[in-house]
């Protein structure tokens, strides 16, 4: 027999969490000032009129370096709890962590060999 009243808290939470964003959009649409004009369509750079082309393209090299940084940064975050509890954990967890470290290292060596990390 299913007791549906056990899920009352879930349904209440679901309703409230659905209504709050909808209300936020409705209230902001009602209270926001409506302004139209040429200033609305101009680009804004810290209150200064942009000189030249405001949109520049970044080279893909910057994204490659950022991606490598993020991969190793996330890996460091995951390795910290392992390093703190290293003495309690067994050899199998050490091997798993070693594999976890070797996968990004092999990927970065591959990228380095292909020239993806060259700055020039």
UniProtKB/Swiss-Prot annotation:
Class in the EC hierarchy, top level: translocase
Keywords: Chloroplast, Membrane, NAD, NADP, Plastid, Plastoquinone, Quinone, Thylakoid, Translocase, Transmembrane, Transmembrane helix, Transport
TM region positions: 9-29, 64-84, 88-108
A GO cellular-component term linked to this record: chloroplast thylakoid membrane
EC number of this enzyme: 7.1.1.-
Keyword Transmembrane helix part of the UniProt annotation: yes
Alphabetical list of InterPro entries matching this protein: NAD(P)H_OxRDtase_bac/plastid, NADH_UbQ/plastoQ_OxRdtase_su3, NDAH_ubi_oxred_su3_sf
Subcellular location: Plastid, Chloroplast thylakoid membrane
Catalysed reactions, semicolon-separated: a plastoquinone + NADH + (n+1) H(+)(in) = a plastoquinol + NAD(+) + n H(+)(out); a plastoquinone + NADPH + (n+1) H(+)(in) = a plastoquinol + NADP(+) + n H(+)(out)
Main location (coarse class): plastid
Single GO biological process annotation from the record: photosynthesis, light reaction
GO molecular function: NADH dehydrogenase (ubiquinone) activity; quinone binding
Membrane topology annotation: Multi-pass membrane protein
Family (UniProt): Belongs to the complex I subunit 3 family.
Purpose of the protein: NDH shuttles electrons from NAD(P)H:plastoquinone, via FMN and iron-sulfur (Fe-S) centers, to quinones in the photosynthetic chain and possibly in a chloroplast respiratory chain. The immediate electron acceptor for the enzyme in this species is believed to be plastoquinone. Couples the redox reaction to proton translocation, and thus conserves the redox energy in a proton gradient.
PANTHER family membership: NADH-UBIQUINONE OXIDOREDUCTASE CHAIN 3
Subunit structure: NDH is composed of at least 16 different subunits, 5 of which are encoded in the nucleus.
Name this protein carries in UniProt: NAD(P)H-quinone oxidoreductase subunit 3, chloroplastic
Organism listed in the record: Nuphar advena
